[in-house]
Amino acid sequence: MNESRKTPLVLVILLICIFLPTFAAVPFPQQDSTLVIKDVLIQTSAAYLWLSPVIHVATVVLLIALYRYRSKIGRVADAFFGILFLFFAFSNHIAVTENYGLTVITSNLVPISIVGLFWMWEVYRPHNEYTFERLPAWRYWVLPFVFLAFWSPINASLSPDFNPLLLLTSSFGVMYCPTTPLIIAILTLIYPKVNMLVLRTTSLVGLVIGLFNTMSFFIMPGYTLWNLILHTPLIFISAYGLLIPILVKKNIPPETLHKEK
């Protein structure tokens, strides 16, 4: 199957997966799905925070190494991101809760797993070229949003917490939503020298999950405006990742564009 047909098919499959139902050992009415998801995320958001400093430091080291050594360590970066997505898929979306027993948020677990597998395939057949050439100034708009996601200044009650220590201990690196913006942003900064299937699948899943979080502000008890604001990096950068082929073609010479891979 050629690329022009394969990519839309993959995106449609991902969209279908995002609407899979949540499963729990204790049956529940579908109208309570948001409460079930809330129970899972409350538990999983704290379960692996002990790993956060390690992943924060590893990410910074990787970014410095990418800037210095570029595509020489491209496969290391691809593997790191792929492992993170597979980790998020299972660690963030499976929990044994007090109210519902073993619970699986399949609508997130399946598509994020697929994204992770695409990243692992990128390790095997790499197409991302981490060259970081000089870009027009407007293309760096993602950086403040990446910093916000990396910091994730929020406390357990979902209120603002601008403690600088969170630059080392926030949920970045152990939760999907604050970590994905950085990964997509990196791809946009090396575009067009990217694996387009990886960029599109990662961006689509990020955008849909980000938009579902927007809906949670209206239907999930305890979901705060600040938590919604902290999901704007995921929404904006994911949307940009999908639209960048349209936006950038108008701003760079056509001969510099790579074909889809």
For the regions a language model picked out, list residue spans one by one.
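Non-cytosolic membrane-interface motifs at loop->transmembrane helix junctions
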Residues: 98-110, 132-135, 163-173, 223-233
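Juxtamembrane membrane-water interface segments of multi-pass membrane proteins
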Residues: 1-3, 32-34, 62-73, 123-136, ...
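Short aromatic-rich membrane-water interface segments that cap or initiate transmembrane helices
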Residues: 38-51, 163-180
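C-terminal transmembrane-bundle signature of multipass membrane proteins
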Residues: 19, 180-261
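Juxtamembrane "helix-exit" motif on the non-cytosolic side of transmembrane helices
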Residues: 25-29, 90-100, 152-164, 213-223
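Hydrophobic cores of alpha-helical transmembrane segments in multi-pass inner/ER membrane proteins
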Residues: 10-21, 49-64, 110-126, 176-190, ...
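N-terminal topogenic module of multi-pass integral membrane proteins
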Residues: 1-101
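Alpha-helical transmembrane segments of multi-pass integral membrane proteins
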Residues: 10-22, 79-91, 107-125, 134-159, ...
